[in-house]
């Protein structure tokens, strides 16, 4: 939505890049992760995914991802790709550990992974009928924190090396409540976390917005009824410019 729809594969590629980086990170540190430490590792990684999802959203909505014919385009979209990839680093590491350290067979773990992915796809479609995309992203982070709560119940979660005091990585229940509350509150206001620039247009978040609806790949916002010259693509040079009542759709 922040850019143009043909960049959907760019977003998917950023997600796959993050997951691959997470899996490689686990592989290069394979001696550090054992079957006994799996509950704690999955708990911390799920919490990391939840926190990174919220922080990534906060950065992403501030980026002016507009298509400009200058070298600025390269660092701009590089920054966007890295911001999008960070949460998936944690999810990729978690999936890699679940597949390689779990006491269950790979078939069972992979089936659970695919079932979760399918539920997530359908869940996003359902959630977007009730709230906006940034709020759904925050609620997705809450879902990851919920997974961390379940992982924590499977065994002890000792503090990670180098962490003297327990933080949110060790308190998935608190993280779940915070992200769920913020996600619900964000969906109840037009002044919450929202993109600054949408398809080359600066978002003003005016109170005159009459209707706003999101789906899996777009957003429609309708302004108030007003008098203005006809606004359309490819008008005839003979078309009258008499102002008419119309609404602005973005």
Briefly describe each language-model feature range.
Residues 1-249:
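Alpha-helical transmembrane segments of multi-pass membrane proteins
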């Amino acid at each position: 939505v922040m850019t143009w729809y043909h960049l959907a594969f760019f977003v998917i590629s950023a997600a796959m890049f993050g997951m691959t980086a997470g899996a490689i990170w686990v592989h290069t540190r394979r001696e550090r992760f054992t079957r006994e430490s799996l509950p704690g590792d999955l708990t911390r990684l799920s919490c990391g995914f939840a926190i990174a999802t919220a922080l990534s959203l906060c950065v992403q909505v501030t980026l002016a991802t507009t298509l400009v014919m200058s070298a600025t385009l390269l660092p701009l979209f590089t920054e966007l790709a890295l911001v999008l990839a960070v949460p998936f680093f944690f999810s990729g590491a978690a999936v890699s550990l679940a597949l390689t350290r779990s006491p269950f067979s790979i078939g069972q773990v992979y089936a659970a992974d695919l079932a979760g992915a399918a539920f997530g796809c359908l869940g996003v479609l359902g959630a977007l009928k009730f709230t906006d995309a940034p709020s759904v992203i925050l609620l997705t982070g809450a879902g990851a924190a919920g997974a961390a709560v379940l992982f924590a119940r499977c065994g002890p979660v000792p503090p990670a090396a180098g962490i003297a005091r327990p933080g949110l990585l060790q308190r998935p229940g608190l993280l779940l409540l915070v992200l769920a509350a913020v996600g619900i509150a964000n969906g109840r206001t037009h002044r919450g976390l929202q993109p600054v620039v949408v398809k080359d247009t600066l978002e003003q978040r005016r109170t005159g917005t009459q209707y706003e609806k999101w789906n899996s790949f777009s957003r429609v916002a309708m302004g108030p009824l007003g008098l203005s010259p006809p606004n359309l693509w490819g008008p005839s040079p003979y078309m009258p410019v008499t102002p008419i009542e119309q609404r602005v759709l973005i």
